[in-house]
Design a protein with these regions (language model features):
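Ankyrin repeat structural motif
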Residues: 1-7, 27-37, 60-70, 90-100, ...
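A generic tandem-repeat structural signature
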Residues: 1-58
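The conserved C-terminal loop/turn that links adjacent ankyrin repeats
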Residues: 9-11, 39-43, 72-75, 102-106, ...
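Ankyrin-repeat boundary/"N-cap" motif
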Residues: 13-22, 45-54, 76-86, 108-122, ...
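Acidic, serine/proline-rich, intrinsically disordered low-complexity segments
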Residues: 91-92, 104-107, 114, 118, ...
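A short, surface-exposed interaction/processing loop segment used at functional sites
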Residues: 256-279
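Well-ordered alpha/beta subsegment
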Residues: 274, 284-290
Length: 290
């Protein structure tokens, strides 16, 4: 028992498994109060950076969430990560607890699960959960915050092909986001060739690539292209999807004035060719990636 361990000099703040995390994950208030009284650190993280809120959620000890908050590990200061992680569980009672205690609803710090800096709303959009998206928006979630690679909830809905969700976000966004002149101004620094602009304004943006490992490629309409930064370099995402390769994106690189492929997982950029060369034989150009 906890008492026996304390009496025999156990380190309550062991770096691998701090006692406070074990208590909130597996035990009740009596044990939690006991370890805290004997010096357990309420802000402790374990070896994989899990905090008390996450530990209680892993153990489904939802009744301990309020205790953790009341002991001083506050939702406002520390609850963002656990809140974002619990979005995919669709447990609205738990989400209400965090929101009622002033969680940062737009929390978007990177971690091992979400290195690409999504907000909880972006996570809900990625799971194509419109009900959750509406719930978060009703509680103040910002629809304009982008992930590390420029994707915002609207762009995610477009990528997922969920037009109902895309329309929902579009109606919440500033009108200039969907204004052509505004988009052209935004794209000026990218120095897009005229032929690329007219291609992206055209109706034919989906291509089957039967002889290629990529199977198919679909481009984003001009208005939905996504500017983002790779280090200090500006890139423009052009592809909506590249067959089964979810981590690859076809981008325009204004520095080289060429089409390139951005590998999201490894954060690498592979230069391909000029746009007219790319469009004349997409399958062959893409094969060079292997």
């Amino acid at each position: 028992s906890a008492q026996w361990l304390v009496e025999h000099g156990a380190d309550l703040n062991d770096e691998e498994n701090p006692s406070f995390l074990l208590a909130v994950r597996y035990a009740d208030q009596k044990v939690i109060d006991y370890v805290v009284e004997h010096g357990a650190n309420i802000h402790a993280l374990n070896s994989v950076d899990v905090d008390a809120f996450q530990a209680a959620l892993y153990g489904k000890r939802y009744e301990n969430l309020q205790l953790i908050h009341d002991l001083g590990h506050s939702v406002q200061k520390y609850g963002g990560r656990a809140f974002r992680n619990v979005i995919t569980d669709q447990n609205y009672e738990v989400l209400d607890f965090f929101i009622n205690n002033s969680v940062d609803i737009n929390y978007n710090k990177p971690d091992s699960v979400y290195p690409f800096k999504p907000t909880p709303l972006c996570v809900a959009a990625r799971y194509v959960d419109l009900q959750m998206c509406k719930y978060l928006v009703e509680h103040g979630a910002d629809v304009t915050i982008t992930e590390k690679d420029g994707m915002r909830p609207y762009s995610i809905a477009i990528e997922k092909g969920d037009m109902e969700m895309a329309e929902y976000f579009k109606n919440l966004e500033p009108a200039e986001y969907h204004d052509k002149q505004n988009k052209m101004d935004q794209l000026k620094p990218f120095k897009l060739p005229k032929v690329l602009i007219s291609f992206l304004e055209g109706d034919n943006l989906y291509f089957e690539l039967p002889d290629s490992d990529f199977i198919s490629i679909e481009f984003l309409p001009l208005l939905d292209t996504v500017p983002f930064k790779w280090g200090r370099r500006k890139l423009l995402r052009l592809s909506k999807e590249l067959g089964e390769y979810n981590d690859y994106q076809i981008v325009w690189d204004p520095k080289s004035k060429k089409i390139s492929c951005y590998d999201m997982e490894h954060q690498e950029l592979r230069e391909l060719c000029k746009f007219d060369e790319f469009i004349s034989d997409m399958a062959e150009q893409l094969e060079t990636l292997f």
